[in-house]
């Protein structure tokens, strides 16, 4: 009697466990961690980058800090996938606009979805290529070559940054006529 009661209890436990496993969705999308390749010459540092699932794509969320006195109005970034086998694939190359005050920090979620299917075991690397402010533009020289070297494990190549005056978005100078 006791052994049949124990067998019945175990059968019920196994059946409920099997039923619970079938109820879970098979294609559950999760947040994807992103490694950030920091470029030291840029006035923006990116931290805590993650891809959030949303409507068939992913949104990039990150925390940014501004190391300059001028307000940052946008940036251009590259998101690359590193396959387990060693191949790389460009996922996104985007320009995003936002407002980040001088010496400020902000958490941002870029609302333009990135459409791709992440594979299990892939690494994702984010690199900022260009930073825009009203006074200046910071551009990484040979950003593609630097990112390719970083992805292959060659950390000896450091990116060079060129800073130029922003003549398009620069505020107009006040002229005093005597």
How would you label these PLM feature ranges?
Residues 17-20:
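Sec/Tat signal peptide C-region and signal peptidase I cleavage site
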Residues 113-173:
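Terminal connector regions
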Residues 66-71, 85, 168:
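Short, acidic/polar linear motifs in exposed loop/turn regions
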Residues 81-91:
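Short aromatic-acidic-glycine turn motif
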Residues 89-118:
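Intrinsically disordered, low-complexity Pro/Gly/Ser/Thr-rich segments with frequent PxxP/GP/PP motifs
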Residues 4-14:
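Sec-dependent N-terminal signal peptides
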Residues 70-74, 89, 172-174:
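Short acidic/proline- and small/hydrophobic-mixed sequence motifs that coincide with surface turns
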Residues 23-61, 146-177:
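Low-complexity, acidic Ser/Thr/Pro/Gly-rich terminal tails and inter-domain linkers that flank the onset
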């Amino acid at each position: 009697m006791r052994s049949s009661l124990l067998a019945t209890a175990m059968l019920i436990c196994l059946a409920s466990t099997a039923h619970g496993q079938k109820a879970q969705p098979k294609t559950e999308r999760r947040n994807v961690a992103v490694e950030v390749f920091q470029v030291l010459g840029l006035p923006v540092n990116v931290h805590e980058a993650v891809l959030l699932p949303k409507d068939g794509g992913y949104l990039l969320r990150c925390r940014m800090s501004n190391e300059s006195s001028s307000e940052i109005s946008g940036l251009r970034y590259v998101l690359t996938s590193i396959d387990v086998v060693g191949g790389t694939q460009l996922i996104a190359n985007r320009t995003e606009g936002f407002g980040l005050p001088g010496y400020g920090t902000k958490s941002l979620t870029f609302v333009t979805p990135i459409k791709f299917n992440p594979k299990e075991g892939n690494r994702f690397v984010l690199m900022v290529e260009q930073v825009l402010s009203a006074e200046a533009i910071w551009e990484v020289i040979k950003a593609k070559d630097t990112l390719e070297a970083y992805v292959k494990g060659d950390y000896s190549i450091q990116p060079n940054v060129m800073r130029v005056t922003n003549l398009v978005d620069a505020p107009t100078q006040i002229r005093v006529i005597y």
